[in-house]
């Protein structure tokens, strides 16, 4: 057996102090947090300091089952774009935060078959991110100065879009991690 990885660090999670709110993410994409979303979630938006707004999460997929494989020690702070219309660092009606989040499904490219394999999460239908506005200034996606433009060196005219459908509704033995899609009855017609 390989030697156990030695660590001299004392582990302390970023979630160990402060107030955090959990957000579920069903699929990969750019997500928007605005005052309406936060208010509907029961959060007092008057307490939010946009300069300190942070989002933590490690994206989709399951942690490795093999104990010796690399895995994150803690949640990673994600870079975010903050639109603060009047630059007052308060969450006003037109202000919002954007960031790219990964859902629970991961994809591997299989060279032999020249296709992708979707790997669903065995235990959940969402991945989770945590938001806070109590710490230091959060990481941001940098913007170009006004009027400055980048010249693209590649123009994309087409791309492959992956669509993955797996409902995981049937477990024949009512136990374990083996799930199947929709139960097929005598009627062979199925509309998706």
Where are these regions (language model features)?
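Structured catalytic cores of large enzymes
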Residues: 1-26, 41-192
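A short glycine/threonine-centered beta-strand motif
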Residues: 27, 32-40
């Amino acid at each position: 057996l390989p030697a156990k990885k030695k660590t001299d660090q004392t582990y302390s999670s970023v979630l160990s102090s402060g107030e955090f709110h959990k957000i579920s993410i069903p699929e990969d994409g750019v997500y928007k947090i605005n005052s309406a979303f936060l208010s509907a979630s029961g959060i007092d938006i008057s307490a939010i300091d946009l300069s300190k707004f942070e989002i933590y999460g490690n994206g989709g997929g399951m942690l490795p089952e093999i104990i010796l494989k690399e895995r994150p020690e803690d949640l990673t702070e994600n870079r975010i774009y903050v639109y603060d219309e009047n630059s007052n660092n308060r969450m006003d009606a037109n202000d919002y935060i954007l960031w790219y989040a990964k859902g629970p499904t991961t994809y591997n490219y299989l060279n032999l078959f020249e296709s992708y394999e979707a790997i669903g999460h065995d235990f959940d239908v969402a991945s989770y991110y945590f938001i806070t506005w109590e710490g230091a200034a959060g990481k941001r996606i940098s913007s170009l100065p006004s009027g400055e433009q980048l010249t693209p060196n590649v123009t994309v005219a087409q791309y492959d879009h992956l669509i993955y459908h797996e409902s995981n509704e049937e477990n024949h033995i009512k136990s374990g991690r083996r799930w199947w899609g929709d139960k097929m009855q005598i009627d062979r017609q199925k509309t998706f």
